[in-house]
Regions:
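Primarily recognizes the serine-hydrolase "nucleophile elbow" in alpha/beta-hydrolase
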Residues: 111-113, 119-164
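C-terminal catalytic histidine-bearing segment of alpha/beta-hydrolase fold enzymes
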Residues: 181-184, 188-259, 264, 270-283, ...
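The feature captures the conserved acid-bearing segment of alpha/beta-hydrolase catalytic domains
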Residues: 49, 145-216
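A domain-start/cap signature at the N-terminus of enzymes
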Residues: 17-56, 99, 128, 239-242, ...
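Active-site machinery of serine-nucleophile hydrolases
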Residues: 55-112
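Short solvent-exposed coil/turn linkers within tandem alpha-helical repeat scaffolds
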Residues: 198-202, 259-279, 314-325, 333-348, ...
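Gly/Ser-rich "nucleophile elbow"/oxyanion-hole loop immediately N-terminal to the catalytic nucleophile
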Residues: 47-54, 96-127, 131
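Sec-dependent signal peptide recognition
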Residues: 3-11
Length: 382
């Protein structure tokens, strides 16, 4: 396993002027690592970048090795809050050792070229890239935070108490939606999970802005950064407005609870703590929480049953025929629900389940099943 952080620490002691010739305020792709030119990355330097000060850094990983993809989402936040953002062109879904080596090469190259605040280094990723981002941070114990889009822990590694902050995102139609909900429940260390309208994608630019702002607050909480009263008040006011705008008791409960977690010790939060306590005493909230858990359990059960049926295709004979028949029946019904004209919970669940099938079915060696699944794919939905 490649351990990235020791290399970066050693490299950081000798910040050079190698990066002074790269343009600021725009995405630059194809930057070659000095130690291994086969390793390249895209980078965004804030327009005000200068080696006279140290800068926060986000190392980003796309599941298809598209280094520019995350930078398109993060560049506005990077410009506003003074972050350098880099995306590897070599890290991608596949053997983790390849992506971890790419992370090491990119990280080492960047701290050689640019003036980096080593207390403010973050990782970010989408799907399999999010698992790499988490793996890098879990191995280092020095990262300030991870922004994880549509996936959480790497395979076989879980922890409820992490040494870094986690901002997670999932789309309402994201096939890893349940995984991110579970991550929210598992973590006891500083974290925030936000669901947005969409699928299995990078977080949109406005949410990337919120993620970076949240990391700024966490840096103040952990004393990695000095208190910025103006920024604190700005984010506090925006989040307070979010609480007030909630249209359900469950939404208010979750938003107010997050306010207490995020701002305790930085701003006056007793009002929100009292709001949480009052809601906890209401049967209607308990009913809403129970329904939410029941819905998630139902979806997880359906997902498990579909996976079992897919495995049954490998049995051959009558067992394979029975599994295929059940899959066709269930997936046809899900496809009909997914095509609904209204944005209902049923439609969202159907699209999440189908999205997972579209990915997982690629590994199923059954041509008839593959052809059937392909017939269900829709280029675009409302």
């Amino acid at each position: 396993m490649v351990r990235m952080w020791p290399r970066m620490l050693l490299a950081a002691v000798a910040v050079a002027a190698l990066g002074q010739d790269l343009p600021r305020g725009q995405i630059v792709d194809g930057v070659k690592c000095a130690m291994d030119p086969s390793q390249t990355y895209a980078i965004y330097l804030p327009s005000s970048y200068s080696a006279d000060r140290q800068w926060s850094l986000i190392l980003a990983f796309d599941p298809r090795g598209r280094g520019k993809a995350p930078l398109e989402q993060y560049k506005d936040a990077a410009e506003k809050y003074g972050y350098i953002v880099a995306g590897s062109n070599n890290a991608r879904n596949g053997p983790p050792e390849i992506s971890l080596n790419a992370a090491a090469m990119m990280g080492s190259d960047i701290v050689h070229r640019f003036s980096i605040n080593m207390k403010r280094v973050y990782t970010a990723g989408l799907s399999g890239g999010a698992r790499i981002a988490m793996k890098v941070a879990m191995d280092s114990n020095e990262m300030a935070g991870v922004i994880a889009s549509s996936a959480g822990f790497p395979p076989g590694e879980r922890s409820s108490n992490l040494s870094f902050a986690v901002f997670g995102t999932a789309g309402t139609e994201d096939f890893n939606y349940l995984e991110m909900r579970q991550l929210d429940e598992e973590l006891s260390s500083p974290h925030r999970i936000v669901v947005f309208g969409g699928g299995h994608t990078w977080l949109p630019p406005d949410l990337a802005m919120q993620a970076v702002e949240w990391m700024e607050i966490q840096a103040m909480q952990s004393e990695r950064a000095p208190r910025d009263e103006k920024l604190l008040q700005k984010v506090f006011d925006a989040r307070s407005a979010e609480v007030a705008a909630q249209k359900s008791e469950l939404g208010t409960f979750e938003a107010a609870s997050a306010m207490v977690r995020d701002f305790e010790g930085l701003r006056d939060v007793p009002k929100f703590a009292a709001q949480v306590q009052a809601l906890q005493e209401k049967k209607t909230l308990l009913d809403a929480l129970n329904k939410q858990h029941a819905d998630e359990h139902f979806e997880a059960q359906l997902e498990s049953e579909l996976m079992d049926l897919q495995e049954g295709l490998e049995d051959g004979g009558d067992a394979r025929t029975a599994s295929l028949s059940q899959l066709k029946d269930r997936l046809t019904k899900l496809s009909q629900q997914a095509a609904g004209s209204e944005d209902t919970q049923e439609r969202r669940m159907a699209r999440r389940l189908l999205g997972g099938i579209f990915v997982d079915s690629r590994a199923v060696p059954d041509q008839e099943y593959q052809k059937f699944v392909d017939s269900l794919r829709q280029p675009a939905r409302n």
